[in-house]
């Protein structure tokens, strides 16, 4: 369904922006097994889209390039879990709703698609139902859906620590022209963490007063994604796709999250668009998307 069609068919629509881990440091592990992370996160101007409409009974429909991959996932889909959790808060006032998810992002690909969808569902349903929750209550509810959901609620540049629930805005982070690239190979997040050789790595360090793309690019380049080496063991195509981005002129390449999506930062959107088109020509069966990330000032 085209974006214009979604807006016409559904009275309330929300964007679920792709979440990009510019840096991800694994700094420890809690007694309950959750890993402690330091992350520099931003969000892209591409992603999934959700539509919401009053209905006689609850309904959930899918479209988009990757929609079929979620078909039959009604028991575990985060959008439906978000609906049900929010309905517990609002009770009978939360009338039945038809939710449509236009799934444009690859599934389980390290760019927060499911978490962003859940966050967009929370935002959209509150608008449709004409209700709201206090900020802290909404953040607590979001965390029940997953560690990434609170930051996806924000959808702006931030630093996330702990398991992802300790969030701090980064107002000075600039926008970046970028290509997202994914070989469409699944990566098991638990297996990636299991293969980590060290789990008590150095924390993310950001100098105060950073400004400008060049300064931030140097900081990001000096940082790392501790999950990339084990992910490359599981999916060798990650190394291939990173090299392809570099060959097309990327200033910096890195894997996002637990993979397999990689990003390449380019000097301009024109260069990013040219690179994405060329890469798609080389591998039309893979995913390439030129995009621009949001700035801290938004």
Curated annotation (Swiss-Prot):
Signal peptide: none
EC number(s) on file: 2.7.1.148
BP-aspect Gene Ontology terms: isopentenyl diphosphate biosynthetic process, methylerythritol 4-phosphate pathway; terpenoid biosynthetic process
Record GO terms (molecular function): 4-(cytidine 5'-diphospho)-2-C-methyl-D-erythritol kinase activity; ATP binding
Class of enzymatic activity (EC top level): transferase
Active-site annotation: 19, 148
Domain of life, source organism: Bacteria
One Pfam family matching this protein: GHMP_kinases_C
Entry-linked InterPro entries: GHMP_kinase_C_dom, GHMP_kinase_C_sf, GHMP_kinase_N_dom, IspE, Ribosomal_Su5_D2-typ_SF, Ribsml_uS5_D2-typ_fold_subgr
Reaction catalysis annotation: 4-CDP-2-C-methyl-D-erythritol + ATP = 4-CDP-2-C-methyl-D-erythritol 2-phosphate + ADP + H(+)
Organism of this sequence: Rhizobium leguminosarum bv. trifolii (strain WSM2304)
Main function: Catalyzes the phosphorylation of the position 2 hydroxy group of 4-diphosphocytidyl-2C-methyl-D-erythritol.
Protein's pathway: Isoprenoid biosynthesis; isopentenyl diphosphate biosynthesis via DXP pathway; isopentenyl diphosphate from 1-deoxy-D-xylulose 5-phosphate: step 3/6
Keywords per UniProt: ATP-binding, Isoprene biosynthesis, Kinase, Nucleotide-binding, Transferase
Residues the record lists as binding ATP: 106-116
Highest classification ranks of the organism: Bacteria, Pseudomonadati, Pseudomonadota, Alphaproteobacteria, Hyphomicrobiales
Family: Belongs to the GHMP kinase family. IspE subfamily.
Protein's name in the database: 4-diphosphocytidyl-2-C-methyl-D-erythritol kinase
């Amino acid at each position: 369904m085209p974006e214009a069609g979604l807006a016409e068919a559904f009275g309330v629509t929300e964007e679920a922006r792709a979440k990009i881990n510019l840096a991800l440091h694994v700094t420890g592990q809690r007694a309950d097994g959750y890993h402690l992370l330091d992350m520099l996160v931003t969000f892209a101007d591409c992603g999934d889209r959700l539509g919401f409409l009053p209905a006689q009974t609850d309904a959930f429909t899918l479209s988009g390039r990757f929609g079929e991959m979620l078909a039959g996932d009604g028991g575990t889909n985060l959008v439906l879990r978000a609906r049900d959790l929010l309905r517990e808060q609002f009770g009978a006032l939360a009338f039945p709703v038809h939710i449509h998810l236009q799934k444009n992002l690859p599934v389980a690909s390290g760019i927060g698609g499911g978490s962003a969808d859940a966050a967009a569902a929370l935002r959209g349903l509150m608008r449709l139902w004409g209700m709201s929750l206090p900020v802290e209550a909404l953040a607590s509810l979001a965390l029940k859906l997953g560690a990434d959901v609170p930051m996806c609620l924000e959808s702006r540049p931030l630093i996330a620590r702990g398991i992802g629930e300790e969030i701090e805005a980064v107002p000075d982070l600039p926008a970046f022209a970028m290509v997202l690239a994914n070989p469409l190979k699944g990566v098991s997040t638990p297996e990636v963490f299991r293969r980590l050789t060290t789990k008590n790595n150095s924390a993310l360090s950001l100098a105060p007063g950073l400004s400008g793309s060049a300064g931030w690019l140097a900081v990001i380049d000096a940082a790392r994604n501790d999950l990339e080496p084990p992910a490359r063991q599981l999916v060798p195509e990650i190394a291939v796709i990173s090299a392809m981005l570099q060959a097309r002129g990327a200033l910096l390449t890195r894997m996002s999250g637990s993979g397999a999506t990689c990003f390449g930062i380019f000097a301009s959107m024109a260069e990013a668009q040219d690179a994405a088109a060329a890469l798609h020509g080389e591998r039309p069966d893979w995913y390439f998307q030129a995009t621009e990330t949001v700035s801290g000032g938004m």
